[in-house]
Design a protein with these regions (language model features):
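Flexible hinge motifs at transmembrane-helix junctions and intramembrane kinks/re-entrant loops
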Residues: 2-4, 156-170, 188, 213-217
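Membrane-interface "cap" regions at the ends of multi-pass membrane proteins
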Residues: 2-70, 101, 112, 121-122, ...
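Helix-loop-helix junctions that connect adjacent transmembrane segments
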Residues: 42, 198, 202-256
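Select transmembrane alpha-helical segments in multipass membrane proteins
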Residues: 47-59, 125-137, 170-174, 234-250, ...
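Helix-loop junctions at the membrane interface of multi-pass solute transporters
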Residues: 58-59, 72-77, 104-109, 119-122, ...
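Extracellular loop-to-transmembrane helix junctions
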Residues: 74-121, 126-135, 145-174, 199, ...
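Hydrophobic, small-residue-rich membrane helices and short re-entrant helix-turn-helix hairpins
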Residues: 185-194, 259-288
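Extracellular/periplasmic helix-exit of transmembrane alpha-helices
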Residues: 211-221, 280-313
Length: 316
Protein backbone atom coordinates (compact mmCIF):
# COMPACT_ATOMS: atom_id res chain seq x y z
CA UNK A 1 0.00 0.00 0.00
CA UNK A 2 1.40 3.40 -1.01
CA UNK A 3 0.38 6.96 -0.15
CA UNK A 4 0.55 10.05 -2.33
CA UNK A 5 0.01 13.72 -1.39
CA UNK A 6 -2.04 15.32 -4.20
CA UNK A 7 -2.75 18.58 -2.39
CA UNK A 8 0.32 20.50 -3.50
CA UNK A 9 2.26 22.08 -0.67
CA UNK A 10 -0.63 21.83 1.79
CA UNK A 11 0.61 19.07 4.10
CA UNK A 12 -2.30 19.45 6.54
CA UNK A 13 -4.69 17.40 4.44
CA UNK A 14 -4.60 13.63 4.91
CA UNK A 15 -2.86 11.80 2.08
CA UNK A 16 -4.84 9.73 -0.36
CA UNK A 17 -4.45 5.98 -0.07
CA UNK A 18 -3.55 4.27 -3.35
CA UNK A 19 -4.04 0.55 -3.53
CA UNK A 20 -1.10 -1.44 -4.86
CA UNK A 21 -1.22 -5.00 -6.07
CA UNK A 22 -2.01 -7.25 -3.12
CA UNK A 23 -1.04 -10.82 -2.43
CA UNK A 24 -3.61 -13.47 -1.65
CA UNK A 25 -2.67 -13.30 2.04
CA UNK A 26 -3.19 -9.52 2.10
CA UNK A 27 -6.60 -9.86 0.44
CA UNK A 28 -7.58 -12.55 2.93
CA UNK A 29 -6.35 -10.37 5.79
CA UNK A 30 -8.42 -7.44 4.54
CA UNK A 31 -11.47 -9.68 4.18
CA UNK A 32 -11.12 -10.86 7.80
CA UNK A 33 -9.95 -7.65 9.50
CA UNK A 34 -11.42 -5.03 7.17
CA UNK A 35 -9.79 -2.18 5.27
CA UNK A 36 -6.98 -0.26 7.00
CA UNK A 37 -7.82 3.07 8.64
CA UNK A 38 -6.24 6.33 7.60
CA UNK A 39 -4.85 7.47 10.95
CA UNK A 40 -4.23 10.97 9.58
CA UNK A 41 -7.92 11.52 8.98
CA UNK A 42 -9.07 14.06 11.61
CA UNK A 43 -12.58 12.52 11.59
CA UNK A 44 -11.47 8.95 12.19
CA UNK A 45 -12.28 8.87 15.92
CA UNK A 46 -15.69 10.40 15.31
CA UNK A 47 -16.45 7.63 12.83
CA UNK A 48 -15.36 4.72 15.04
CA UNK A 49 -16.49 6.05 18.44
CA UNK A 50 -19.73 4.84 20.02
CA UNK A 51 -22.75 6.81 21.19
CA UNK A 52 -24.44 5.66 24.42
CA UNK A 53 -26.88 3.30 22.70
CA UNK A 54 -24.18 1.58 20.61
CA UNK A 55 -21.91 1.39 23.66
CA UNK A 56 -24.77 -0.28 25.53
CA UNK A 57 -25.05 -2.82 22.72
CA UNK A 58 -21.31 -3.45 22.50
CA UNK A 59 -20.32 -3.27 26.16
CA UNK A 60 -23.68 -4.01 27.78
CA UNK A 61 -23.82 -7.40 26.11
CA UNK A 62 -20.95 -8.44 28.38
CA UNK A 63 -23.02 -7.79 31.48
CA UNK A 64 -26.41 -8.85 30.12
CA UNK A 65 -25.11 -12.21 28.94
CA UNK A 66 -24.52 -13.17 32.57
CA UNK A 67 -28.26 -12.94 33.26
CA UNK A 68 -28.64 -16.09 31.15
CA UNK A 69 -26.92 -18.22 33.80
CA UNK A 70 -26.31 -16.16 36.98
CA UNK A 71 -29.89 -16.09 38.36
CA UNK A 72 -30.36 -19.76 37.46
CA UNK A 73 -27.25 -20.80 39.41
CA UNK A 74 -28.35 -18.76 42.42
CA UNK A 75 -31.84 -20.28 42.34
CA UNK A 76 -30.45 -23.80 42.00
CA UNK A 77 -28.33 -23.24 45.11
CA UNK A 78 -31.46 -22.54 47.16
CA UNK A 79 -32.59 -26.13 46.75
CA UNK A 80 -35.94 -26.64 48.45
CA UNK A 81 -35.70 -23.25 50.17
CA UNK A 82 -37.02 -21.30 47.18
CA UNK A 83 -38.82 -18.86 49.48
CA UNK A 84 -35.43 -17.14 49.91
CA UNK A 85 -35.56 -16.16 46.23
CA UNK A 86 -37.46 -12.98 47.09
CA UNK A 87 -34.51 -11.80 49.19
CA UNK A 88 -32.15 -12.96 46.47
CA UNK A 89 -34.07 -10.86 43.96
CA UNK A 90 -33.72 -7.72 46.07
CA UNK A 91 -30.06 -8.40 46.86
CA UNK A 92 -29.27 -8.95 43.18
CA UNK A 93 -30.90 -5.69 42.06
CA UNK A 94 -29.28 -3.70 44.89
CA UNK A 95 -25.84 -5.17 44.15
CA UNK A 96 -26.14 -4.31 40.46
CA UNK A 97 -27.01 -0.69 41.21
CA UNK A 98 -24.25 -0.36 43.84
CA UNK A 99 -21.60 -1.70 41.46
CA UNK A 100 -22.90 0.48 38.62
CA UNK A 101 -22.90 3.58 40.82
CA UNK A 102 -19.34 2.80 41.94
CA UNK A 103 -18.13 2.52 38.35
CA UNK A 104 -19.97 5.73 37.45
CA UNK A 105 -17.95 7.51 40.14
CA UNK A 106 -14.77 5.92 38.81
CA UNK A 107 -15.64 7.16 35.31
CA UNK A 108 -15.89 10.72 36.66
CA UNK A 109 -12.50 10.52 38.39
CA UNK A 110 -10.75 8.61 35.58
CA UNK A 111 -12.25 10.06 32.37
CA UNK A 112 -9.56 8.49 30.16
CA UNK A 113 -10.28 4.94 31.29
CA UNK A 114 -11.05 3.72 34.77
CA UNK A 115 -10.57 -0.02 34.71
CA UNK A 116 -9.45 -1.97 37.75
CA UNK A 117 -5.81 -1.90 36.65
CA UNK A 118 -5.67 1.89 36.32
CA UNK A 119 -7.60 2.60 39.52
CA UNK A 120 -5.65 0.13 41.65
CA UNK A 121 -2.31 1.29 40.23
CA UNK A 122 -3.06 4.97 40.83
CA UNK A 123 -4.63 4.66 44.28
CA UNK A 124 -2.95 1.60 45.81
CA UNK A 125 0.24 0.97 43.87
CA UNK A 126 1.47 -0.94 40.80
CA UNK A 127 1.46 -4.35 42.52
CA UNK A 128 -2.23 -4.06 43.30
CA UNK A 129 -2.78 -2.90 39.72
CA UNK A 130 -1.16 -6.07 38.38
CA UNK A 131 -3.38 -8.21 40.63
CA UNK A 132 -6.50 -6.34 39.49
CA UNK A 133 -5.51 -6.50 35.83
CA UNK A 134 -4.75 -10.22 36.04
CA UNK A 135 -8.10 -10.86 37.71
CA UNK A 136 -9.82 -8.93 34.93
CA UNK A 137 -8.14 -11.04 32.25
CA UNK A 138 -9.23 -14.23 33.99
CA UNK A 139 -12.73 -12.79 34.37
CA UNK A 140 -12.96 -12.03 30.64
CA UNK A 141 -11.80 -15.54 29.73
CA UNK A 142 -14.39 -17.09 32.04
CA UNK A 143 -17.12 -14.72 30.84
CA UNK A 144 -16.54 -15.66 27.20
CA UNK A 145 -16.24 -19.40 27.83
CA UNK A 146 -19.18 -19.65 30.24
CA UNK A 147 -21.44 -17.42 28.12
CA UNK A 148 -20.75 -19.38 24.94
CA UNK A 149 -21.13 -22.72 26.73
CA UNK A 150 -24.40 -21.57 28.30
CA UNK A 151 -25.68 -20.40 24.92
CA UNK A 152 -24.85 -23.80 23.41
CA UNK A 153 -26.67 -25.57 26.26
CA UNK A 154 -29.77 -23.42 25.73
CA UNK A 155 -29.78 -23.97 21.96
CA UNK A 156 -29.18 -27.73 22.09
CA UNK A 157 -31.85 -28.18 24.76
CA UNK A 158 -34.38 -27.55 21.96
CA UNK A 159 -32.72 -29.97 19.54
CA UNK A 160 -32.84 -33.77 19.35
CA UNK A 161 -30.22 -35.60 21.46
CA UNK A 162 -28.72 -37.07 18.27
CA UNK A 163 -27.06 -33.74 17.41
CA UNK A 164 -25.54 -33.18 20.87
CA UNK A 165 -22.07 -34.21 19.62
CA UNK A 166 -21.96 -30.99 17.56
CA UNK A 167 -22.09 -28.86 20.71
CA UNK A 168 -18.31 -28.56 21.17
CA UNK A 169 -17.88 -27.57 17.53
CA UNK A 170 -20.54 -24.85 17.88
CA UNK A 171 -18.87 -23.51 21.05
CA UNK A 172 -15.46 -23.28 19.36
CA UNK A 173 -17.01 -21.71 16.26
CA UNK A 174 -18.79 -19.12 18.40
CA UNK A 175 -15.55 -18.10 20.12
CA UNK A 176 -13.75 -17.82 16.77
CA UNK A 177 -16.53 -15.70 15.24
CA UNK A 178 -16.62 -13.33 18.22
CA UNK A 179 -12.83 -12.99 18.14
CA UNK A 180 -12.81 -12.13 14.43
CA UNK A 181 -15.64 -9.62 14.85
CA UNK A 182 -13.76 -7.79 17.58
CA UNK A 183 -10.56 -7.76 15.52
CA UNK A 184 -12.41 -5.79 12.84
CA UNK A 185 -13.08 -2.99 15.34
CA UNK A 186 -15.49 -1.98 18.08
CA UNK A 187 -18.08 -0.33 15.84
CA UNK A 188 -18.04 -3.13 13.27
CA UNK A 189 -18.59 -5.79 15.94
CA UNK A 190 -21.40 -3.74 17.51
CA UNK A 191 -23.14 -3.37 14.14
CA UNK A 192 -22.93 -7.11 13.49
CA UNK A 193 -24.14 -8.13 16.96
CA UNK A 194 -26.88 -5.50 17.32
CA UNK A 195 -29.67 -7.75 15.92
CA UNK A 196 -28.71 -10.53 18.35
CA UNK A 197 -28.55 -8.10 21.28
CA UNK A 198 -31.90 -6.49 20.48
CA UNK A 199 -33.48 -9.92 19.96
CA UNK A 200 -32.22 -10.90 23.42
CA UNK A 201 -33.71 -7.75 24.98
CA UNK A 202 -37.06 -8.01 23.18
CA UNK A 203 -37.58 -11.72 23.81
CA UNK A 204 -36.69 -11.42 27.50
CA UNK A 205 -39.03 -8.45 27.92
CA UNK A 206 -41.87 -10.34 26.24
CA UNK A 207 -41.30 -13.53 28.22
CA UNK A 208 -40.82 -11.81 31.59
CA UNK A 209 -43.77 -9.45 31.19
CA UNK A 210 -45.90 -12.24 29.76
CA UNK A 211 -44.92 -14.61 32.55
CA UNK A 212 -45.84 -12.04 35.19
CA UNK A 213 -49.09 -11.00 33.48
CA UNK A 214 -50.38 -14.55 32.89
CA UNK A 215 -49.47 -15.75 36.38
CA UNK A 216 -50.45 -12.78 38.52
CA UNK A 217 -53.14 -14.97 40.04
CA UNK A 218 -50.31 -17.00 41.58
CA UNK A 219 -49.18 -14.02 43.67
CA UNK A 220 -51.27 -14.95 46.78
CA UNK A 221 -49.87 -18.49 46.64
CA UNK A 222 -46.32 -17.13 46.35
CA UNK A 223 -46.82 -14.80 49.33
CA UNK A 224 -48.23 -17.68 51.39
CA UNK A 225 -45.36 -20.00 50.42
CA UNK A 226 -42.78 -17.34 51.31
CA UNK A 227 -44.32 -16.72 54.75
CA UNK A 228 -44.67 -20.44 55.41
CA UNK A 229 -41.12 -21.11 54.22
CA UNK A 230 -39.63 -18.39 56.42
CA UNK A 231 -41.49 -19.67 59.48
CA UNK A 232 -40.35 -23.25 58.89
CA UNK A 233 -36.81 -22.14 58.07
CA UNK A 234 -36.48 -20.10 61.25
CA UNK A 235 -37.76 -23.01 63.30
CA UNK A 236 -35.46 -25.52 61.60
CA UNK A 237 -32.23 -23.57 61.00
CA UNK A 238 -32.55 -20.37 62.96
CA UNK A 239 -31.45 -16.97 61.69
CA UNK A 240 -27.80 -18.01 61.28
CA UNK A 241 -28.70 -21.10 59.26
CA UNK A 242 -31.03 -19.22 56.93
CA UNK A 243 -28.42 -16.52 56.47
CA UNK A 244 -25.86 -19.18 55.53
CA UNK A 245 -28.26 -20.65 52.94
CA UNK A 246 -28.91 -17.21 51.51
CA UNK A 247 -25.21 -16.27 51.31
CA UNK A 248 -24.41 -19.57 49.59
CA UNK A 249 -27.02 -18.92 46.90
CA UNK A 250 -25.98 -15.27 46.59
CA UNK A 251 -22.34 -16.18 45.99
CA UNK A 252 -23.29 -18.93 43.52
CA UNK A 253 -25.08 -16.27 41.48
CA UNK A 254 -22.16 -13.85 41.55
CA UNK A 255 -21.66 -14.44 37.84
CA UNK A 256 -24.61 -12.09 37.34
CA UNK A 257 -22.36 -9.13 38.13
CA UNK A 258 -19.57 -9.92 35.67
CA UNK A 259 -19.24 -7.49 32.79
CA UNK A 260 -20.53 -4.37 34.54
CA UNK A 261 -16.96 -3.03 34.56
CA UNK A 262 -16.81 -3.16 30.74
CA UNK A 263 -18.15 0.40 30.41
CA UNK A 264 -15.44 1.79 32.66
CA UNK A 265 -12.77 -0.18 30.79
CA UNK A 266 -14.05 0.88 27.36
CA UNK A 267 -14.48 4.61 27.88
CA UNK A 268 -11.74 5.32 25.29
CA UNK A 269 -13.99 4.21 22.42
CA UNK A 270 -16.97 6.37 23.39
CA UNK A 271 -18.19 9.51 21.69
CA UNK A 272 -17.40 12.92 23.21
CA UNK A 273 -18.27 13.98 25.83
CA UNK A 274 -16.92 10.63 26.98
CA UNK A 275 -17.86 10.90 30.64
CA UNK A 276 -21.48 11.75 29.88
CA UNK A 277 -21.71 9.00 27.26
CA UNK A 278 -20.20 6.44 29.64
CA UNK A 279 -22.56 7.42 32.46
CA UNK A 280 -25.60 7.05 30.20
CA UNK A 281 -24.32 3.66 29.06
CA UNK A 282 -23.87 2.58 32.67
CA UNK A 283 -27.47 3.57 33.47
CA UNK A 284 -28.76 1.58 30.48
CA UNK A 285 -26.75 -1.46 31.53
CA UNK A 286 -27.73 -1.30 35.22
CA UNK A 287 -31.45 -1.01 34.51
CA UNK A 288 -31.52 -3.69 31.81
CA UNK A 289 -29.46 -6.16 33.86
CA UNK A 290 -31.45 -5.60 37.07
CA UNK A 291 -34.78 -5.94 35.25
CA UNK A 292 -33.68 -9.07 33.37
CA UNK A 293 -32.13 -10.88 36.35
CA UNK A 294 -34.89 -9.83 38.73
CA UNK A 295 -37.62 -10.68 36.24
CA UNK A 296 -36.24 -14.18 35.77
CA UNK A 297 -36.27 -14.80 39.53
CA UNK A 298 -39.85 -13.48 39.79
CA UNK A 299 -40.96 -15.88 37.05
CA UNK A 300 -39.26 -18.76 38.87
CA UNK A 301 -41.43 -18.00 41.90
CA UNK A 302 -44.65 -17.47 39.94
CA UNK A 303 -44.18 -20.70 38.00
CA UNK A 304 -43.21 -22.55 41.19
CA UNK A 305 -40.01 -23.80 39.57
CA UNK A 306 -38.29 -26.53 41.58
CA UNK A 307 -34.50 -26.97 41.18
CA UNK A 308 -33.53 -30.13 39.32
CA UNK A 309 -31.74 -31.61 42.35
CA UNK A 310 -34.98 -31.47 44.34
CA UNK A 311 -36.88 -33.21 41.53
CA UNK A 312 -34.33 -36.02 41.57
CA UNK A 313 -34.60 -36.30 45.36
CA UNK A 314 -38.39 -36.55 45.12
CA UNK A 315 -38.11 -39.57 42.81
CA UNK A 316 -35.68 -41.43 45.08
Amino acid sequence: METENTSGNNSDEPPLIIESEQSMFERFKRFILGAPRNIRDPQIFHRISLIAFLAWVGLGADGLSSSAYGPEEAYRALGEHTYLAIGLLLATAITIFIISYTYSRIIEHFPYGGGGYVVASKLLGPKYGVVSGSALLVDYVFTISVSIASAADQIFSFLPPQVAHFKLFIVILGIVVLSLLNLRGAKESVTALMPVFLLFIVTHCILILGGIAFHMFEAPRVVHDIKHGFNNGLGMFGVAGMLALFIRAYTRGAGTYTGIEAVSNGIQIMREPKVETARKTMVYMAISLAVTAGGILICYLLYNIVPESEIGRAHV
